[in-house]
Amino acid sequence: MRQKLRVAAYAVCVRDGQILLARSPGPDGTPEWVLPGGGMEHGEDPYDTVRREVTEETGYRIEVTGLLGVDSSRRVVPGGRPPRRTDHQGLRIIYEGEVTGGELRYEVGGSTDLAAWQDLAAVPGLTRVRLVDVALRLWRERPPHGRLEAPESLSRPRRSNEE
């Protein structure tokens, strides 16, 4: 089985009771809301990654104001030629950010198609990725160790069809 590690950095930007989110097509094509952010390029510092990604996806420049925590997941996905499974681990670094400049715009030709401020109270009703909830809990609770709870058994990866 192939192994793959993806490291990414995301920002929680909250102002006036709203959070900055981006919209991305989900695995089945259904749009879902995500945090602005994304994968690190080789040799890039995660601090620089989150600033670059927020600008690419929203048009805003941010100041990183804190490190909220880290989220990790692991899953096995089928696929490839010849057919073989991939044991995929994702490591997501979650920062707090404050918008310092730029103008809200949509990413053209990227992984997202819309950026918007969403009311914090409306987030539970949005179609969103799990990371949005994890990041909001980190932002609200501020655990001193930067972790909400032990990740879902990283020693036993979940299959892609498991909830």
Label each region the model flagged.
Residues 74-104, 138:
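Active-site-adjacent beta-strand/loop module that shapes the phosphate/pyrophosphate-binding cleft
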Residues 18-56, 60:
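Conserved Nudix-box catalytic region and its N-terminal flanking loop in Nudix hydrolases
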Residues 19, 65, 88-94, 115:
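Structural motif
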Residues 1-19, 39-41, 96:
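Conserved N-terminal beta-strand and adjoining loop/helix that marks the start
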Residues 28, 104-163:
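Nudix hydrolase/Nudix homology domain
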Residues 3-5, 32, 83-91, 109-112:
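A generic structural micro-feature
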Residues 61-70:
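A short coil-to-beta-strand element that immediately follows conserved catalytic motifs
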Residues 13, 94-98, 116-119:
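Short, well-ordered beta-strand micro-motif
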